[in-house]
């Protein structure tokens, strides 16, 4: 790659320790009808200035975020403190908090856009697809010490993309219909320009060159407009994993955060040991994303560049065993072990379908069940 202008350099803050942070998106639903409610602005105004409560693209959404935490357990404590504050304000206005990748019968046409120039510009550019973004997710940040590690970690972490998506898949329904997918959200979000799978760069210089080209050609104005499923967060000094569908309860969220934390720290330590991290051809990565979105925990995934395949839950058994020493060092062994409960007991998309079947297809009961899970 040719040399870049000096102003194209992107400074990566770097994290002295492998800390973790979480962003958790919630929808607001009417307590009686279970329909989405566009009252986020009023809720946030009532709560007042709070760095842990954010607005999002749609006025039916509130996001809560942690500070800088050492492990999953600390992050859950941070989130739960904020969650209790937000829930009081929400319930005081006749609403409930709901979290899944999609709302089972929500109508995108009824959603209102949050008043902010960047959101208006997004919809102006993306039009119909942008207005379809009636979706919710979880983002996990893990601190990385230096820029040269970031792209190798991201490129190798894509090997575990289907594991993370299958475990969190919680969006089988769209506009009142069963889509046949475990994660319809994953299929929807990638329709936005600059969203979807990251390019498998190996150096920070390649990433800087990509961003330079994106800005020069008017594709983006700001780095935050790169909406990859896994991306660098240079200001925070983190790798940000954005694969997860919305997670409806603290128990599963804690497990998924621990898994993400351990995966990235494991890759980081392997780099320190001089290992060249494994990567797969992008066509395998793309296929794995689709298989996990379609089949969830029943997906047979591609494991490596040699095209070997295996049931994702069987591979998770070995992955969890491999990560046990990392989890012990990060003081999240119990949280990592709880990952197994998700695929042994059933994922969110499976629970939602079961509730719908048991209630003659009444999707309000699905919303009720998900609201109830947040109490756990």
UniProtKB/Swiss-Prot annotation:
Gene Ontology annotations of biological process type: modified amino acid biosynthetic process
InterPro entries cross-referenced by the UniProt entry: GCL_type2/YbdK_subfam (IPR050141), GCS2 (IPR006336), Gln_synth/guanido_kin_cat_dom (IPR014746), YbdK (IPR011793)
Pfam family, one: GCS2
Keyword DNA repair attributed: no
Any one Gene Ontology molecular-function term assigned to this protein's record: ATP binding
Enzyme class at the top of the EC tree: ligase
This protein's UniProt keywords: ATP-binding, Ligase, Nucleotide-binding
Segments traversing the membrane: none
EC id: 6.3.2.2
Reactions mediated catalytically: L-cysteine + L-glutamate + ATP = gamma-L-glutamyl-L-cysteine + ADP + phosphate + H(+)
Taxonomy, superkingdom: Bacteria
Family: Belongs to the glutamate--cysteine ligase type 2 family. YbdK subfamily.
PANTHER family the UniProt entry points to: GLUTAMATE--CYSTEINE LIGASE 2-RELATED
Reported function: ATP-dependent carboxylate-amine ligase which exhibits weak glutamate--cysteine ligase activity.
Protein name: Putative glutamate--cysteine ligase 2-1
Organism lineage: Bacteria, Bacillati, Actinomycetota, Actinomycetes, Mycobacteriales
């Amino acid at each position: 790659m040719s040399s870049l202008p000096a102003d194209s350099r992107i400074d990566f803050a770097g994290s002295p320790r492998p800390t973790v942070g979480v962003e958790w998106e919630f929808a607001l639903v009417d307590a009686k009808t279970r329909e989405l409610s566009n009252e986020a602005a009023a809720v946030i105004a009532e709560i007042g200035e709070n760095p842990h409560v954010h607005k999002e693209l749609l006025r039916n959404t509130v996001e809560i975020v942690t500070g800088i935490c050492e492990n999953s357990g600390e992050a859950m404590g941070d989130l739960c403190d904020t969650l209790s504050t937000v829930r009081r304000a929400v319930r005081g206005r006749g609403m409930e908090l709901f979290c899944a990748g999609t709302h089972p019968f929500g109508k995108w046409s009824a959603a209102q856009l949050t008043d902010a120039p960047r959101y208006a510009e997004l919809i102006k550019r993306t039009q119909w697809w942008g207005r379809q973004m009636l979706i919710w997710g979880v983002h996990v940040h893990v601190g990385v010490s230096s820029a040269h590690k970031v792209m190798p970690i991201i490129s190798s972490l894509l090997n575990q993309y289907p594991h993370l998506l299958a475990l969190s898949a919680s969006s089988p329904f769209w506009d009142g219909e069963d889509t046949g997918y475990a994660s319809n959200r994953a299929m929807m979000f990638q329709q936005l320009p600059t969203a979807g799978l990251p390019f498998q760069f190996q150096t920070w210089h390649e990433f800087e060159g990509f961003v330079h080209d994106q800005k020069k050609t008017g594709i983006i104005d700001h780095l935050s407009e790169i909406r990859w499923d896994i991306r660098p967060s240079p200001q925070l000094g983190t790798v940000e994993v954005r694969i997860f569908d919305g997670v409806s309860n603290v128990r599963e969220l804690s497990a998924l955060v621990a898994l993400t934390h351990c995966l990235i720290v494991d890759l980081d330590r392997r780099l320190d040991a001089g290992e060249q991290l494994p990567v797969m051809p992008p066509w395998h990565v793309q296929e794995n994303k689709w298989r996990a979105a379609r089949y969830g925990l029943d997906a047979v995934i591609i494991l490596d560049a040699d095209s070997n395949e295996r049931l994702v839950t069987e591979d998770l058994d070995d992955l969890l065993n491999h990560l046990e020493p990392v989890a012990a060092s990060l003081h999240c062994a119990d949280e990592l072990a709880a990952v197994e409960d998700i695929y042994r007991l059933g994922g969110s998309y499976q629970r939602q379908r079961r509730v719908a079947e048991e209630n003659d297809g009444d999707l309000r009961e699905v919303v009720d069940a998900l609201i109830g899970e947040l109490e756990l």
